[in-house]
């Protein structure tokens, strides 16, 4: 869905709002799940002509700083919390990393730096994942179905 909308707008890239907290949580969650592929994945945007590359301009800004900026500039839209959050691994990881960051400032940055260092030391052939096409909608994906079609399939 994002790719399609970005193509319709003739966009060069899609900027996401992922902040340092999100990035660090994802790194830890991938390792806790034993998902080495996702932990080390990077997509070759040349492998799918429909893929619009993602950029993360806030990935080195803390969630606290990002929210403060949004509040000061009237940019935040109140969003209800997902009722299933309490069951998600991310909630536990977020709480744990928040406590670590409070006790040992810089923890989140060190996690993100460590992940970048790990990726920089890996051979490109080990890191880059070729994108294919979703079997249902034809959008770029590293899986049989894209995330949107997976969600639709779960709902039906």
Q: Where do the language-model regions lie?
A:
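Short cysteine-rich clusters marking metal-coordination/redox-active sites
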Residues: 133-137, 146-149
């Amino acid at each position: 869905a994002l790719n399609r909308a970005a193509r319709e707008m003739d966009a060069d890239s899609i900027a996401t709002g992922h902040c340092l907290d999100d990035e660090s949580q994802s790194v830890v969650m991938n390792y806790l799940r034993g998902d080495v592929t996702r932990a080390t994945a990077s997509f070759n945007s040349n492998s799918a002509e429909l893929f619009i590359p993602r950029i993360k301009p806030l990935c080195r800004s803390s969630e606290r700083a990002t929210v403060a900026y949004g509040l000061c500039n009237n940019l935040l839209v109140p969003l209800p919390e997902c009722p299933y959050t309490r069951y998600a691994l991310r909630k536990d990881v977020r709480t744990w990393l928040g406590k670590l960051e409070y006790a040992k400032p810089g923890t989140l940055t060190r996690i993100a730096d460590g992940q970048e260092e790990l990726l920089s030391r890996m051979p490109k052939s080990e890191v880059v994942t070729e994108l294919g096409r979703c079997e249902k909608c034809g959008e770029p994906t590293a899986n049989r179905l894209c995330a949107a079609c997976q969600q639709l399939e779960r709902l039906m």
